[in-house]
C-alpha cells in the first residue's frame, strides 16, 4: 500500500526527489541491498547533495518511511472523510482498496514491515517509525469499529488488523490474487461483533 506512484514531477524539491528515488529502490530491492551510490545515480544527485539533506542512510530511511506513512494517510482519507457511508462500509472499502494493491504482481509488501524485518534491534529510529505506522493503522480500525457500533471495538479492530497484515504477507510471498472473497469475510467478521438487539 501507499506506493501508487513513483513518477517524479518537475516541481519536486531536491529533498523529495531523493526520497522518491530511495523509496522506489528500497521497495523493490530492500534496504541493505540498496547502496548509496545507486540512490545517487537514480536521483541524479552528487554525494555532497545527498549528505546535505540526509547525513546518514538511516536518516534517509526514516524520511522514506515517514513519506510512505503520509502517502497512505492521504490515500485513506478519501475513504475516511466520506460522510455518506457508515463505519462498517468504510472498513469494507479499506479492505477492497487494499486487495486491489495486494493483487498487483508488482506489490513488494508493506515497506514498514520490510524495514522492521531488516532493522529490528539494530536501529531504534527506524523501529519507531515502523511501530508508529502500524499503531496508526490499528487506531484507524479501532475508530471505525466504534463507528460501526461493535460490541468490543478493540477486539474487532485487532482482528481486522491481523487480517489486513496477513493479506499483505500472503500477497508478498505467493504473488497471486487472493482466492477467497475478502469482502464477504470482513463483512461476516464485523457482523459477528454487532449487537443485533440495538440495531
Task: Name what the model sees in each region.
Residues 127-131, 147-193, 197-199:
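Hydrophobic/aromatic-rich alpha-helical bundle segments in the mid-to-C-terminal region
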Amino acid at each position: 500500500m501507499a506506493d501508487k506512484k513513483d513518477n517524479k514531477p518537475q516541481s519536486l524539491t531536491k529533498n523529495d526527489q531523493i526520497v522518491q528515488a530511495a523509496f522506489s529502490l528500497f521497495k523493490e530491492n530492500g534496504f541493505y541491498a540498496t547502496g548509496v551510490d545507486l540512490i545517487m545515480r537514480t536521483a541524479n544527485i552528487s554525494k555532497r547533495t545527498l549528505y546535505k539533506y540526509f547525513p546518514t542512510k538511516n536518516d534517509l530511511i526514516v524520511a522514506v518511511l515517514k513519506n510512505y506513512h503520509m502517502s497512505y494517510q492521504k490515500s485513506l482519507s478519501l475513504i475516511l472523510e466520506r460522510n455518506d457511508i457508515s463505519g462498517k462500509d468504510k472498513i469494507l472499502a479499506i479492505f477492497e482498496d487494499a486487495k486491489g494493491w495486494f493483487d498487483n504482481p508488482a506489490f513488494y509488501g508493506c515497506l514498514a514491515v520490510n524495514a522492521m524485518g531488516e532493522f529490528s534491534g539494530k536501529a531504534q529510529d527506524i523501529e519507531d517509525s515502523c511501530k508508529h505506522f502500524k499503531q496508526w493503522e490499528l487506531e484507524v480500525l479501532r475508530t471505525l469499529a466504534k463507528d460501526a457500533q461493535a460490541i468490543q471495538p478493540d477486539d474487532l479492530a485487532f482482528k481486522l488488523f491481523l487480517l489486513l497484515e496477513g493479506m499483505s504477507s500472503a500477497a508478498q510471498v505467493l504473488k497471486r490474487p487472493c482466492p477467497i472473497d475478502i469482502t464477504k469475510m470482513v463483512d461476516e467478521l464485523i457482523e459477528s461483533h454487532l449487537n443485533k438487539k440495538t440495531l
